[in-house]
């Protein structure tokens, strides 16, 4: 009597395993995130993603570092911000029919240069003025590209609780 019961249980386990395997293959292929076994596509982020990943956090950190008069960190963040703009201009050379390198140049070149001087001289007032100019340049670019609703401001608080912006003592 045990033989037929065990045989039936083994058969049920085999059928259940096969069903799970088929369903998991079907689910992976139908996943909204794509097939995990597929070859990766080239990374092609959109303008908004690049701004959120590369530009906005660096703009914020630059402002926080300058506000704390942490000039080495401010200099580093300025370099990172310049590199971020270069990546954006290369990754998306034209956006909405407009030349991105020219937009970036017109919006931020002068304030970035003034920020560089202020940081090297460790001159807080000039830093604040240049940073305000950078922020206005960002917003002017947004207005030019019909995104005036994206308003950047001088940060009033840190969104990076795991980073100290005051200079080390």
What are these regions (language model features)?
Residues 30-169:
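Sequence context surrounding c-type heme c attachment/ligation sites in exported
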Residues 1-13:
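Bacterial N-terminal signal peptides that target proteins for export
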Residues 20-23, 29:
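Boundary at the C-terminal end of the N-terminal hydrophobic targeting segment
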Residues 24-25, 146:
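C-terminal ends of transmembrane alpha-helices
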């Amino acid at each position: 009597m045990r033989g037929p019961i065990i045989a039936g249980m083994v058969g049920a386990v085999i059928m259940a395993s096969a069903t799970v395997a088929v369903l998991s293959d079907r689910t992976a292929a139908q996943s909204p995130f794509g097939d995990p076994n597929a070859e990766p596509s080239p990374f092609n982020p959109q303008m908004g993603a690049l701004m959120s990943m590369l530009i906005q956090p660096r703009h914020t950190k630059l402002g926080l570092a300058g506000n704390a008069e942490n000039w080495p960190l401010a200099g580093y963040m300025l370099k990172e911000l310049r590199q971020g703009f270069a990546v954006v201009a290369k990754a998306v050379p034209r956006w909405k029919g407009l030349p991105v390198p020219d937009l970036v140049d017109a919006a931020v070149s002068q304030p970035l240069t003034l920020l560089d001087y202020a940081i090297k001289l460790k001159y807080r007032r000039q830093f604040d003025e240049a940073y305000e100019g950078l922020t206005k340049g960002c917003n002017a670019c947004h207005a030019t590209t019909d995104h005036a609703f994206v308003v950047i401001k001088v940060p009033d608080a840190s969104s990076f609780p795991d980073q100290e912006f005051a200079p080390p003592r």
